[in-house]
Regions:
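Internal mixed-charge
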Residues: 7, 91-196
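Intrinsically disordered, low-complexity coil segments
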Residues: 20-25, 68-73, 106-111
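Short, intrinsically disordered N-terminal pre-domain segments
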Residues: 1-24, 195-196
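Divalent metal-cofactor coordination and adjacent catalytic microenvironments
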Residues: 32-102, 127-143, 147
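Short secondary-structure subsegments characteristic of cysteine-rich extracellular domains
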Residues: 27-46, 153-170
Length: 196
């Protein structure tokens, strides 16, 4: 069985964060948009669960392409780096839209932006075997449901997914006290990080 770190990285990649888009001029397919949006809630839960353990945060200057070159105030589109797992911040732009690997901002000075993004996860903190198993199974079933587009498979996968997601929520709630205790301990030891 995969380690929690491998599972977390695989899950982030599977859930629409790395759709097959290699050319910024290629339109993002509707299916990619739906796929990314469908997993948004689960993705947020996964990211929230592992956020304290994200590592390898990169800052990257990205050049973009104006959507309307004739308009100096045109929105600009950018393509996230291939290694980007999770976009944390676009400097100076609170109003931006993500479509798979494509980022669209209303206006970018000098047609360039700086991204802060997570390149990898090295430690996922507190995990449980039950979480590993149910989450990997849920992802597998959801991927089958989405990719096959078979009505029966969809219904079966969705039922199973909802059941496993409920179990995930229960496990997450159960571990809340442990996580809080762990967080407080880390804060208390902050002056001496090497002891952690």
């Amino acid at each position: 069985m995969k380690t929690p770190v491998e599972l977390c990285n695989d899950a982030l990649r599977v859930m629409g964060l790395r759709p097959d888009c290699t050319n910024i001029d290629d339109p993002i397919s509707q299916s990619d948009k739906v796929f990314s949006a469908y997993y948004a809630q689960t993705r947020r839960k996964l990211i929230k669960l592992t956020r304290p353990r994200f590592a390898c945060v990169e800052s990257f200057r990205l050049l973009g392409t104006p959507i309307d070159p004739a308009d100096p105030n045109s929105a600009v589109k950018f393509l996230k780096p291939q290694e980007c797992l999770y976009l944390q911040k676009v400097d100076g732009h609170d109003n931006f839209t993500e479509y798979g690997r494509e980022i669209v901002v209303p206006r970018a000075i000098d047609k360039a932006i700086y991204l802060n993004y997570v390149r990898d996860v090295v430690d996922t903190g507190i995990w449980s075997d039950e979480f590993d198993e149910l989450f990997s199974a849920a992802l597998a079933k959801k991927c089958v449901q989405f990719l096959t587009k078979d009505a029966t498979a969809k219904q079966m996968a969705d039922t199973e997914y909802q059941s496993q997601l409920a179990t995930f929520n229960a496990l997450n709630a159960r571990d809340t006290k442990i996580k809080k205790k762990h967080h407080n301990l880390t804060k208390a030891m902050w002056p001496f990080p090497w002891r952690y």
